[in-house]
Design a protein with these regions (language model features):
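Conserved ABC transporter NBD signature motif
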Residues: 40-51, 55-56
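Conserved ABC ATPase "signature" region
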Residues: 80, 84, 91-109
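Conserved catalytic motifs of ABC-family nucleotide-binding domains
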Residues: 134
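Catalytic Walker B motif of ABC-type/P-loop ATPase nucleotide-binding domains
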Residues: 138-142
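ABC ATPase "signature
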Residues: 196-197
């Protein structure tokens, strides 16, 4: 990651794109307080990523491609576990658990082991758990990998609902059609941000019809490095 600079607004859906090895995962780990940058300045949810990494962790949500769920725990047990980690109180957890299961249509699956859920259901549950504590920002690392297009669209509806509640969404994806769903996107090449704007403006700037065409133009000049 080489001297990247950007700002993300509250409630914005910000796409963080780049090929494997571009530096996306490394940058995200720095923003989440999991890796320490060697230089520069940065704030996440209002907290300094150098001096207040633990505060950063408490005020964010995170979901990886593997969904961050415990397969051998029941649906409600996963919710309770992660809510407890984020310091939520027992009564609040119980109330919000019932609301969440009803909203997702999971009420009948409350006692089902997560490993028995269809992949798309696991995905929706993992995202809902990652924002259960109403974080200021949620980081989604390749969240829709391995699921069908219809399920991906349903997942993005959940993302829009979260953004409407004021939760900032920071998402990495390999699917260029998903880039169109973001308010703004950045594209990393060899550790640097080579483009940052709305999808419409980037397509206009590069004189192309799709975000995939934008990405291909930038990626042609990449020198691949380990992420």
């Amino acid at each position: 990651v080489d001297h990247i600079s950007f700002q993300v607004q509250r409630g914005e859906i910000f796409g963080f794109l780049g090929a494997n090895g571009a530096g996306k995962t490394t940058a995200m780990r720095m923003l989440c307080g999991l890796s320490r940058p060697t230089s520069g300045v940065g704030k996440v949810a209002g907290y300094d990523i150098f001096r207040e990494a633990e505060q950063v962790k408490r005020h964010i949500g995170y979901m990886s491609q593997k969904f961050s769920l415990y397969e051998d725990l029941k649906v409600w047990e996963n919710i309770r576990l992660f809510a407890g980690i984020y310091g939520m109180k027992e009564m609040e957890i119980e109330e919000k658990t019932d609301e969440l299961l009803e909203r997702l249509g999971f009420a009948d699956e409350r006692d089902t082991l997560v490993k028995k859920l269809p992949l798309g259901w696991k995905q929706k549950l993992a995202f809902s758990v990652s924002i259960f504590h109403e974080p200021k920002i949620v980081f989604l690392d390749e969240p829709t990998g391995g699921v069908d297009p219809a399920t991906r669209r349903q997942f993005w509806e959940l993302i829009y609902q979260a953004a409407d509640r004021g939760i900032t969404v920071f998402v990495t994806t390999h699917y260029m059609d998903e880039a169109e769903y973001c308010n703004r996107i950045s594209i990393m090449v060899d550790g640097q941000i080579k483009a940052l704007d709305t999808p419409a403006r980037l397509k206009e700037q590069f004189g192309v019809e799709t975000m995939d065409d934008v990405f291909q133009q930038l990626a042609r000049h990449a020198v691949r490095k380990a992420d």
